[in-house]
Amino acid sequence: MVVPPVTRTARPAEVRAGDPGILSTHIHSDGGHWELLYQPGVGNRNPAVQKTLDERLVYISMQGNEIFKLAVRAMEEVALEALAANNLSTSDIDLFIPHQANRRIIDAIGKRLGLDEEQLFINLERYGNTSSASIPIALDEANRGGRITAGDILLLDAFGGGLTWGAALIRW
């Protein structure tokens, strides 16, 4: 196989203050707590066949109280990490869009971050927990509903199985 030499060089991208775009992303995981939230009957080892259905292995297993505590702590920490990386504070957030898993988690994070109701976007009551689609759905709804305007600072914050959590700071 003949591979042509690299003929182009990489160039740095510059995002000027005020330009729309992703300011930063922050992602973490801790497999040491995987048993708190997982789905045992997935993949090649436990495919969805009658046996795994009968043994209820296709359903999510969650230790709710422990997940609540970990989710609130992790989502708060990663939100503060994103803000610190950009020399911002919670008062700079125009809209906080968290993973729409549980109203108690959202309220607890909002309180710990000192956010007011106008800074929170919650659509959980309309759609329920839509899993990994919750933030994109909420972002689209907030945009279409006029809750986001050009130049706004958005903080997206999520937590999920495995355990994983992350935040993205965006200038709209």
Predicted regions and their residues:
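Short, surface-exposed connector motifs at secondary-structure boundaries
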Residues: N87-D92
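Claisen-condensing/thiolase-fold acyl-transfer catalytic domains that form or cleave C-C bonds
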Residues: V72, E76-A79, L83, D94-W172
